Each structure stands twice: as C-alpha cells, then as structure tokens.
Amino acid sequence: GIHPYIDRIINEVHKLTEKGFIHDEHIKAEKYQYMDELVTTINEYNDILALWIKMKQGSLSLNIETFGLNELFDLIRKGSRAFEMKQQQLEVTPTDTYVKADKALTLFMINTLAENARKYTPKGGKVKVYANPTEEYVEISVEDTGYGLSEEDVTRIVGEKLYNSQEIGILDAADREELLKNKGSGFGLMNCKGIIEKYRKTNEVFRVCLFNVESTLGKGSRFYFRLPKSE
C-alpha cells in the first residue's frame, strides 16, 4: 500500500526540521528530490489501482501513437534517487528506437518493472533498463541482480490472470520477513499483462506484443515486453 511511502515522507520532513538539515542547501535539495519521488510513487500506486479497475470493467482505451523510447528512458533515469537509497546502480541504456503504442501505458509498464526490480534486489545490486530492436518489434527489458524466481513462480506470473502476490517467492526466500515487507498488491504486473492482451486484441499490427519473464533463483530476473517497431 501507500502507507510506507507516507511514513518515509514524514521521516524526511522530521530530518529537515528536527536535525537542522533545513539550513543545508545541498542536503535540503536532496531531501526535496527524494520526497518528490515518494509522492510520485504514491500517485503511481493510485494509477495502478485505477488502471486495474478500468481493465476489469473493460473500459480501458488505448491512445496509439508513434514515439521514441528514449524520451521515456530519460524519465526512468530521473527516478534514480530511490535506487541510490538502496545503494543500487540503475543503468538505463540510451536508445534511438521508435515504437507504435500508448505512450502513457508504456511508461507505466517500464516504471512498474523497474520499481519491482528495485524492491526485490538487495543492496549493492544492479537494475538495467534497455531496448533491443528487431525488424518487427522492440523488446524492452528490465533486468536485475535480485533474488530471482522459481520456475513455478514464473509460470504463475506469466500464465495466471489473477494470483496471490504474497505467495510469489515466499518458499525460496532466504529472508521471508524482508520479502513480505516489500510485497505489493501484485496488480502492477497483472496490469502489464492486461495491457499486452489489450494490444493483441486491437489489430494485426500488435500481434508481436508479448509479456514474459526469465529468472534464475539467486541470480536475478529479466522482465520484458514487446511492442511494434516504428520508423
């Protein structure tokens, strides 16, 4: 839920006021940036729920356009503070590829996968965001050096329309308490799959659309999706 993010904002405000950081312009700027990212995360969480409701009601509409992926990658790069707080490295590889899709939903999907990677990757880990173009489609990947998933969990995430996210990874977790603390609703990934399904039902151009996961326990995961390539 959003409560941990609200608690973090309160904690940052406390540091600014009670610890005297308000007088240090450099620290103050860093704190403001971090709080801004936390507020953005809360808004994104609300967007996830709203999107889920729309998909369940069958009222989700697609605004298809041609756009450059690098514009979205730049936005992802600006959210690096949350990764730095966990001593993680966020690596976003620039790309000159263009896709035909809904821009807002594409950003939502990349954001969702990057946030999941951040949550389930330990301190000192790396999260990579990159795009690989082919003749027909562009494959957008979010790869991490996190805890990884079992084959059974990957099958559930990819194959089941609705699953209990609290059960994913729990049997293989070295620290179950830490894993459960990071758990969300699971709606983010379900929304990503739902968006891809919506594309595939739209017209023949989107037959290349796909959502998939590759993972190795103890080594990390790669979540990826495909969108039609455009010139």
What are these model-derived regions, one by one?
Residues 69, 148-159:
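Short helix N-cap motif at coil->helix boundaries in the Bergerat
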Residues 124-136:
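Short beta-strand/loop element within the Bergerat-fold HATPase_c
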Residues 82-92:
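Short conserved segments within the C-terminal catalytic ATPase subdomain
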Residues 57-62, 94, 98-101:
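Conserved micro-motifs of the catalytic ATP-binding
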Residues 176-179, 197-214:
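Glycine-rich ATP-binding loops of the HATPase_c
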Residues 144:
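Acidic ATP/Mg2+-coordinating residue in the GHKL
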Residues 34-45:
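Short alpha-helical segment of the dimerization/phosphotransfer core of two-component systems
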Residues 117-118:
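Short helix-loop "hinge" at the ATP-lid/N-box region of the Bergerat-fold HATPase_c
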